[in-house]
Amino acid sequence: MARIAGINIPPHQHAEIGLTAIFGIGRTRARKICEACGIAYSKKIKDLTDGDLEKIRDQIAQFTIEGDLRRETTMNIKRLMDIGCYRGFRHRRGLPMRGQRTRTNARTRKGPRKGAAALKK
C-alpha cells in the first residue's frame, strides 16, 4: 500500500482516483499531478514504481494539503468571527452565510428542528 503525505492510498484504485484520498486533492489536481509526473491516469497505484511514487510526493509537496489545509481553513473562519464581519457572525450563529433563506429550509446548517414545546417556554 502506497503512503503519500501520511495517507494510505488504496492500491486497487487508478492513480487519478487514489490521489483524491488526500484532503486538498480533487480530480483536476490529481490529473495535473499525474501529467507532471508522466504517469497514465488509468495506472493502478499498486503498479506504480518507487520512482513514480517519489515523483508524485515531490509534486504534492508544492500544495497545501491535509492538516495544513484544514488548519488554514479553520483559521480563516476564526479570523472572520474575530473581526466581526457578517460572514463571521453567520458562522458563529451556525446559519448559512451566502444569502440563502432561513425562514424555511437551511436545515443542514441549523441542525434538527426544535419542537413546538421547546419554543413556547
Swiss-Prot record:
It comes from Paracidovorax citrulli (strain AAC00-1) (Acidovorax citrulli). PANTHER family: 30S RIBOSOMAL PROTEIN S13/40S RIBOSOMAL PROTEIN S18, SMALL RIBOSOMAL SUBUNIT PROTEIN US13M. SUPFAM superfamilies: S13-like H2TH domain. This is Small ribosomal subunit protein uS13. Keywords: Ribonucleoprotein, Ribosomal protein, RNA-binding, rRNA-binding, tRNA-binding. Part of the 30S ribosomal subunit. Forms a loose heterodimer with protein S19. Forms two bridges to the 50S subunit in the 70S ribosome. Signal peptide: none annotated. One of its GO terms (molecular function) is rRNA binding. GO terms for biological process: translation.
